[in-house]
Amino acid sequence: MKMILAVAAGGGLGAVARYLTGVGLGHWLGTAYPWATMTVNVTGSFAMGVLAGLGAHVWQPAPELRAFLMVGVLGGFTTFSSFSLDVALLVERGAIGAAAAYVAASFLLSVGGLFAGLALIRTAVA
């Protein structure tokens, strides 16, 4: 039961952070392009890389804390379901080039963010 509560609490925090990121970036950059979704996926992937790197090298958190952060907070913060919807909306608006660029940039930057997080921790603990 502790594990479920940890994931639920983290998921709530992550979802609120995602929402606030969307509101903030929407005001700053506009909503014609899905900047908020790409931002949460890239930064969330970077954070996942940092946490995974820490867990592999220097930090052994309790299973509940690990689940709270990685499954809950980051699971609620990042979102590929919204990513898929954003792609579909761009395609349906006829913005095929923007949709393709969004898919490529999101994938490359998210995976790159994870590797950057891992590299940061590997360098810091070396």
Curated annotation (Swiss-Prot):
UniProt-listed InterPro entries: FluC
Subcellular location as annotated: Cell inner membrane
Tagged with keyword Signal: no
Superkingdom, taxonomy of origin: Bacteria
Binding site for Na(+): G75, T78
One Pfam family cited in the UniProt record for this chain: CRCB
Membrane topology qualifier: Multi-pass membrane protein
Reaction catalyzed: fluoride(in) = fluoride(out)
Control of this protein's activity: Na(+) is not transported, but it plays an essential structural role and its presence is essential for fluoride channel function.
Gene Ontology annotations for the cellular component aspect, listed alphabetically: plasma membrane
UniProt keyword terms in alphabetical order: Cell inner membrane, Cell membrane, Ion channel, Ion transport, Membrane, Metal-binding, Sodium, Transmembrane, Transmembrane helix, Transport
Family under the similarity heading: Belongs to the fluoride channel Fluc/FEX (TC 1.A.43) family.
PANTHER family: FLUORIDE EXPORT PROTEIN 1-RELATED
Entry function: Fluoride-specific ion channel. Important for reducing fluoride concentration in the cell, thus reducing its toxicity.
Name the record gives this protein: Fluoride-specific ion channel FluC
Gene source species: Rhodospirillum centenum (strain ATCC 51521 / SW)
Gene of this entry: fluC
